[in-house]
Amino acid sequence: MQTFKKSLVFTAMAAASSAALAAESEKPNIVVIVGDDVGFADTQPYGSEANTPNLMALAEEGVKFTNFHASPTSSVTRSMMLTGANSHEVGLGTFDYAVYPGAIGKPGYEGYLTKKGVTVATLLKESGYNTYLSGKWHLGHDDGFLPDDRGFEESYGILAGGSNHFNRDMMFPAKNAATADALQKGDIPGVEVEPTYRNGEVVEDKYKGEYSDQVYTNEIIKMIDSKKDDGKPFFAYVPFTGIHLPLQAPESAYQDKVDYYVEHGWDSVREDRFQRMKEMGVIPKDADISDRNALSRPWDSLSEKEQKWYGKKMAVAMGMMEMQDQQVGQIVDYLKEIGEYDNTYIMYLADNGPEAADITGENISDLIRTWTAHHFDNSTENLGKANSSVSLGPEWASASTGGLSWYKAYTAEGGIRVLFIVKPAKALLAAEDALQPGTQTDDLSQVKDIAATILEIAEVDHPGTEYQGREVAPMSGVSLLPYFKGETADVHSANNAIPFELFGSGILLKGDYKIIRISTGMGGDSEWHLYNTKKDPAEQHDLRNEMPDLFLEMVAEYQEYEKAQNIVPVDEAWNPFENVK
């Protein structure tokens, strides 16, 4: 009789376990892919001349957002995307490569993802998901703050903001005693290797000579494949390092593009992209292109030799873009091969606008410029190779945005309006009132919405303000699922204010409107301006005098945010580019 009772217990346990496993396996998989420093108009779905058919296919099968906002810099965006919280609440009120001196040591300005941020990976792992990361982390270098500490059961890649795409050498001088000693002696620091980490441990880079995005694609596929038969859903995070500096790619990726960019130049490419975006409905047909800013020169002011050098830079960058698209296609093909594509949400976004800092030019620190010139061969013939190191620079960055205002590091639209494509699971789009495949929307949305969306997809609750006995930052994004299902007309209500600040430059988004203040040190006038960014995405028509009540209301809301977040005032003359280390 006792044996019979035990067998009933074991049978019941087995049945419960099987039911739980079945419930897990029915949950959708989630893949988030991040293109690094990809400009708003750098891909085919958003008006680029570059050939990105795999991103085009995702847009045709899913939803393309044309009014989606990230932060102006890499790690800051990633902190909000993975936690759904305000960046100042989780340690990323600053950018680790350019910290304002007055903010050093202040809460919220740690420069890494603090324990006040609970990542979606942590919560999904606890709920039964397999969680994987392959690529760059850029949210912490110390024990306790690495990917394996923040919810990723398997991870591979670098901790820094970028590295050499062929050999993982550091892109800037190391922040260590050797560099400090060299500088004290008046010497130029050497080039060190960016450590490669697997599951929190430094490992040998077995892929030297292989291209970064290809390496990270192969690794994420290996991770998924290793547990594809365990019945559990997976969350795969693929933060690529392309098309971040240094601009490097196999010659076959860009050799057929050089003549095009030399012949057309940045002014023509910028205008052509702006026009294509109008034709595609990415921006309004009556929108005005942004004025040339003070950092940009006319293409025809360059000598023929200079045009060949600058033209090749953009050719390499767009070769990198097309290679990344191929890696997206490889991931899609793999998911189809294992029968998981239809049950997988795929999200592709950029972390910020294109890189305007020119590491061989004037708008960068003396240390970076001198170090780059000393160690790398940046002749026209050598651009794109492993022993070259260049960045896009302000003029090509302006073309990369398609004519929006400013670029990376700026809170203007060129710095924060980024491409965002979501290919939902098949079951969602099959719902009666759901958005149709190929939908393009100019509804306002933001990077914090991704975390909220991921948790709702996985049917996981956020803990709120307390997790495992410690205070944590609440989510302030909203889930996109009700919008996808046709249950709501807008992602955010017209009254929902979305404030943000970095480097002393603030914004507040609200419905169709945006206030923005850019410091004089970054080329602005340190005054607040008001724009309707749905109609005027290049921020050319200031409405503060036409709509004074709304303007003052939004400024007051931003000031409340500034006070609540204990935002450190930044000297008006300070410039992050000149302080990059």
Go through each PLM region and give its residues.
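Short, solvent-exposed loop/turn and secondary-structure capping segments
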Residues: 41-47, 70, 77-80, 90-95, ...
